[in-house]
């Protein structure tokens, strides 16, 4: 059974790129367009790993991560932040919210899959 990954990003292009990279690597992908929808999909789909953007409407990535970590069954699910941001303070804020790792866009599909394999092991 392949790993199920939830991607949360308001950019349709980025969601499409993630879906292509992840399905090509053999993962099942479910998607959400912002943090609010992300929390709904998280509860419904119960993914093995999450990849989220930070800057999104309705509920940003920090709020999404904090919301996910409030639920016992999602406290240990790896959450990777995939964003254009590289500011150390934003990275620290994401870690404090409960993020597992940080990847800067644009991403290399092979490196993304490598990171997923490492954090999901």
Predicted regions, residues:
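Short, glycine/charged-rich "phosphate-handling" switch motifs in NTP-dependent
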Residues: 100
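C-terminal output helix
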Residues: 107-116
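Conserved acidic segment of CheY-like receiver
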Residues: 2-13, 18-22, 50
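Active-site residues of response regulator receiver
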Residues: 53, 83
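Short hydrophobic/Thr-rich beta-strand motif most characteristic of the beta2 strand and flanking loop
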Residues: 26-33, 41
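Active-site beta3 strand of CheY-like receiver
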Residues: 45-51
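Receiver (REC) domain active-site loop signature in two-component systems and cognate sites
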Residues: 56
């Amino acid at each position: 059974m392949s790993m199920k990954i939830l991607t949360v990003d308001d950019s349709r292009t980025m969601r499409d790129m993630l879906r292509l990279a992840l399905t090509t690597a053999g993962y099942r992908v479910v998607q959400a367009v912002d943090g609010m929808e992300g929390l709904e999909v998280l509860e419904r789909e119960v993914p093995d790993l999450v990849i989220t953007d930070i800057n999104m409407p309705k509920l940003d990535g920090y709020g999404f991560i904090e919301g996910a970590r409030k639920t016992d069954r999602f406290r240990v699910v790896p959450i990777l932040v995939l964003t254009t941001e590289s500011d150390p303070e934003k990275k620290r804020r994401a870690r404090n919210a409960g993020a597992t790792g940080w990847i800067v866009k644009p991403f290399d599909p092979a490196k993304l899959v490598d990171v997923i394999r490492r954090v999901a092991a």
